[in-house]
Regions:
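Boundary at the C-terminal end of the N-terminal hydrophobic targeting segment
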Residues: 15-19
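A short, Trp-centered hydrophobic/proline-enriched beta-strand micro-motif
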Residues: 27-46
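Sec-dependent N-terminal signal peptides
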Residues: 4-13
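Envelope-exposed proteins and targeting segments
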Residues: 33-35, 49, 57-59, 69, ...
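Short, solvent-exposed helix-to-loop capping segments enriched in aromatics
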Residues: 29, 99-111
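Gly/Pro-enriched, hydrophobic low-complexity segments
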Residues: 113-114, 118, 122-195
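Short hydrophobic/aromatic-rich beta-strand segments that constitute the beta-sheet cores
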Residues: 39, 61-65, 80-83, 129, ...
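An acidic-aromatic
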Residues: 48, 52-103, 166
Length: 195
């Protein structure tokens, strides 16, 4: 009787979703031209911030934070710029290649070909892929969390390899909207803030 119950239980329990293939995830990024989403950023210290994220592939992303934060993070021209409205100084700038985010902002993403996938698992309806640039392991890794049906990036976690983790949860996606390039122009933003 116990075996029959177990068999019936297995028959009515839905099978776990299969993980998305690396080729499917690569195609997801490669076919994305522009995207916009709401985000919630969670930091190691327990603090949270919200805002809007804008992506224009390849190589550009913008995070506009909601009040009271009002920070702005821009990626364009191979650079990352962090604008802090509390400081009347130039933005903090560093090369995009020094962040794991560069792996998904490349012109052509090919996860199956490059030796950057550290882990590729699924957790029910979610596929989790952990990426690290093998040539720049000192800059940490990024963990991407996707749902399928429809396939969508829902979250990422960046570990900077010095013990700091930042989690970004995404919702309210829109894709392939017109987006002016000025949104990602760091020099133009600096000039605007100087006036």
């Amino acid at each position: 009787m116990k075996k029959i119950f177990t068999l019936l239980f297995l028959m009515v329990t839905p099978a776990s979703a299969e993980k998305l293939s690396l080729d499917a995830v690569s195609s997801y990024f490669n076919t994305m031209t522009t995207a916009e989403a709401a985000f919630i950023q969670s930091n190691d210290d327990g603090s949270q911030s919200t805002g809007r994220m804008y992506i224009k592939r390849p190589g550009r992303i913008r995070f506009e934070y909601d009040p009271p934060n009002l920070a702005l993070v821009m990626v364009g021209g191979g650079q990352v710029a962090v604008f802090d409205p509390k400081a009347n100084a130039e933005p903090i700038r560093f090369p995009l290649r020094q962040t794991p985010l560069s792996l998904v902002l490349e012109r052509t993403v090919d996860l199956a070909r490059r030796d950057m996938v550290m882990a590729h698992t699924n957790d029910g309806p979610r596929t989790i892929i952990t990426l690290q640039d093998p040539d720049r392991a000192e800059y940490g890794y990024i963990q991407l969390v996707f749902t399928d049906d429809p396939m969508q990036l829902r979250q990422w976690i960046v570990d900077d390899n010095s013990g700091n983790k930042t989690q970004i949860a995404l919702s309210d996606w829109t894709q392939d909207q017109k987006m002016p390039s000025i949104l990602f122009n760091i020099q133009a933003e600096m000039q605007k803030r100087a006036n």
